[in-house]
Regions:
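Nucleotidyltransferase catalytic core that binds NTPs
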Residues: 1-98, 106, 110, 130, ...
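Substrate/ligand-engaging "lid" and interaction regions
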Residues: 103
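Short, basic/aromatic-enriched C-terminal tail that caps enzymatic domains
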Residues: 113, 121-137
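Structured beta-strand/loop patches that form or line metal/cofactor-binding pockets in enzymes
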Residues: 117
């Protein structure tokens, strides 16, 4: 087995990064370096699943990403509540005719549900047709 000193992981699946980091920090002398999510011109995070989408579906996913970026800005400025996020989730589903598994804000440090005056991250999993996309902002 190898014993690396450093591991580089993308933030695209932030929940996975969080759990792996927690596990590794307890068991190994390995430093995890989070790497920013790479996005296309429409703010859609790059993923191998994007190849399963048609041009129109990619455009739709990009519009959804732009909507979520605006929602994240509102979260920072207006201290959105969980109830407001639930309302936005319903708006998003209706506007883009998509199924959403989850749309929620969580504390970056411990993944607890939305907390005021803390560093929160918006998490989403949704479907464009049959392709499930995940992201966080």
């Amino acid at each position: 087995l190898i014993n690396p000193k450093y591991t580089f992981m993308g933030e695209k699946d932030f929940q996975q990064l969080f759990l792996v980091n927690k596990f590794i920090s307890k068991k190994y002398k390995n430093k995890i370096y989070p790497c920013r999510t790479v996005r296309d011109k429409n703010f859609l995070s790059l993923s191998s699943r994007n190849f399963l989408l048609s041009k129109n579906e990619l455009n739709k996913a990009g519009q959804i990403s732009k909507y979520l970026f605006k929602l994240k800005s509102s979260l920072k400025k207006n201290n959105l509540t969980n109830n407001n996020i639930l309302i936005k989730k319903k708006e998003l589903q209706k506007k883009f005719n998509i199924k959403i598994d989850y749309l929620e804000a969580r504390n970056e440090k411990n993944l607890t549900i939305l907390t005021k005056n803390k560093k929160n991250r918006l998490f989403v999993a949704y479907y464009v047709n049959k392709v499930r996309l995940i992201d966080n902002f």
